[in-house]
């Protein structure tokens, strides 16, 4: 029992240590723009996004910088913060990503927790997938920060980058549900107005670093209010169903997302796991102790009659002799039965002879 309580105390001591860790997954840089994910997806607030980019010696990208990154191949289906907006930057249409739209897909709400995009002005102008090995602008702190690059290399550093106390010690769970990583995109919460831009279906012959808004009014993406009678068209998106309806022409639309679920604190999950493990160990120890107590020991009495091996040999000989005696007894019983039958027949014959003589 003492061991059980000792292990439980040791597990409780490990809980805060396991929580004082931050994993930052980063992608390749496209014209200086890259995507950052913290501890799974969608766990970065607006204020933390700015602090995180600053720690990487970067800033939140502008719309023009995002569009330039898309022009050279940057694509992801993840919601993230940029300067003044929350965007999804898909290149190819996908029914479960930005409602089948392409370009810089903008959500007007920026109050929830998402991932973030950062822009490093000193990065190469094209694609750059070299590993990031440092968080240069992080300051001293107790947090273990691990940078996970696209190729799987990991670099760990002790420190802190968050300056907002609400980001360091959140008092309430995030508004949006945090889901595990996948290539598909979750739906945005209901009531958001969404704007988007279009990429051309074929690449133009002119310089691709030109502004993302065309000068010609025919090609300029427009934003129109498609509400009719006080009702706006609704786009229903879901990761699981993959169906979407509504406008895809750049008009304002709203999306309805899945039901929000409260987050379970990590320390509670770890504590429950430790308690379950301790309970299993306690049951195993109790069963093992009971089994040992219930075992029967075989008592061997020698009485000075030689070694145990000699007694085993004599016991085997005795068993053989007893089996032979049983065979003799069976043979003897069968012969006695035959003699009894013969005596009875002779007696009947003599009686018949006497009766004949008497007659």
UniProtKB/Swiss-Prot annotation:
Residues 1-20 form the signal peptide. Glycans are attached at residues 25, 57, 100, 110, 120, 180. The chain crosses the membrane at residues 267-287. Residues 288-359 are cytoplasmic. One of its GO terms (biological process) is wound healing, spreading of cells. Residues 179-193, 233-251 have a biased composition (Low complexity). The modification Phosphoserine is found at residues 289, 314, 323. It is found in: Cell membrane; Cell projection, Microvillus; Secreted. This is CD44 antigen.
């Amino acid at each position: 029992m003492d061991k059980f309580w000792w292990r439980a105390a040791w597990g409780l001591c490990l809980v805060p240590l396991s929580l004082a860790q931050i994993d930052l997954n980063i992608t390749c840089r496209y014209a200086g723009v890259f995507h950052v994910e913290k501890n799974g997806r969608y766990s970065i607030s607006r204020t933390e996004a700015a602090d995180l980019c600053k720690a990487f010696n970067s800033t939140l990208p502008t719309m023009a910088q995002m569009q330039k990154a898309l022009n050279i191949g940057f694509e992801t289906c993840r919601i993230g913060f940029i300067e003044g907006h929350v965007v999804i930057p898909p290149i190819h249409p996908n029914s479960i990503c930005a409602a089948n739209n392409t370009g810089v897909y903008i959500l007007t709400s920026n109050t929830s927790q998402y991932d973030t995009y950062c822009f490093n002005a000193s990065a190469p102008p094209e694609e750059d997938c070299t590993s990031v090995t440092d968080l240069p602008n992080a300051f001293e702190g107790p947090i273990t920060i691990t940078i996970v690059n696209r190729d799987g290399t990991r670099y760990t550093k002790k420190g802190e980058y968050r300056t907002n106390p609400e980001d360091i010690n959140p008092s309430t769970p995030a508004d949006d549900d945090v889901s595990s990583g996948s290539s598909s995109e979750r739906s945005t919460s209901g009531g958001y107005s969404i704007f988007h831009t279009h990429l051309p279906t074929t690449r133009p012959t002119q310089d691709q670093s030109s502004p993302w808004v065309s000068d010609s009014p025919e090609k300029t993406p427009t934003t129109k209010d498609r509400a009719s009678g006080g009702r706006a068209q609704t786009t229903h998106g879901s990761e699981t169903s993959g169906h979407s309806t509504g406008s895809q022409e750049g008009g304002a639309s709203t999306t309805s997302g899945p039901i929000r679920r409260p987050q379970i604190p990590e320390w509670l999950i770890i504590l429950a796991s430790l308690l379950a493990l301790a309970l299993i160990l306690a049951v195993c120890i109790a069963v093992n102790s009971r089994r040992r107590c219930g075992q029967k020991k075989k008592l061997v009495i020698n009485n000075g009659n030689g070694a145990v091996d000699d007694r085993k040999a004599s016991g085997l000989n005795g068993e053989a002799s007893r089996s032979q005696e049983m065979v003799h007894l069976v043979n003897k019983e069968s012969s006695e039965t035959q003699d009894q039958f013969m005596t009875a027949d002779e007696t009947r014959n003599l009686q018949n002879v006497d009766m004949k003589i008497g007659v």
